[in-house]
Amino acid sequence: MAAGRLSPTRRRTLGRMTEPDSPAPVPDAQLPGGALMRLVRPDDAPALLAAYRRNAAHLAPTEPRRGERFLTLEGQAERIAGQLREWEAGRAVPWVLDGSHVPGAPPVLGTLTFTGIVRGPLLSASVGYWVDGEHTGRGLAGQALAQAVAYARDALGLHRLEAGTLLDNTASQRVLLRAGFTWYGTAPDYLHIAGAWRDHHRYQLILGEVEPRP
């Protein structure tokens, strides 16, 4: 992900790709604070379970309500398997923010995920992320998002990324704006979050003038 930018010609060629026969490689990326941004693995299930349990109160205001199985080892294993199937199909990229080599940090510091990767004339994906409540405000989300933006542009050949936030989630809005995203509207009752339908601000980042597949 830290590779140099592709030439405009190469980006146009990527934009004409159909659904890929195999997923684009996802190299590890060392973030400035010491965390490692990498593709999720099946053996991450215990650490992800611990992370979600540890951050239950932190994430509750910004996430949909989860079933009881979500906070079980089996539930996390099933979720990872589903994410990797989506990655293999070219429809998603699920990263974890690995804190194994950060002094005093837990094994999982958060996640960042591309979902809904669409090619053809749209060439777009949605991005979502969260960071451990004890490690917010340290630039980790912004560092991870910068790596993800470069990957979307240079490896996936996408034209656009989109994201949404609750109206009062100013911290996430700042992360998006610093990464170059722009606000383009507010969607009423956009997602069912914390037990109710919630309005969301919508943001997008145009990655380049990519020519879609004919």
Per-region residue spans from a language model:
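A short helix-loop-beta-strand connector motif used in the catalytic cores of GNAT acetyltransferases and
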Residues: 67-70, 81-96
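Conserved GNAT-fold acetyl-CoA-binding loop/helix
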Residues: 58-81
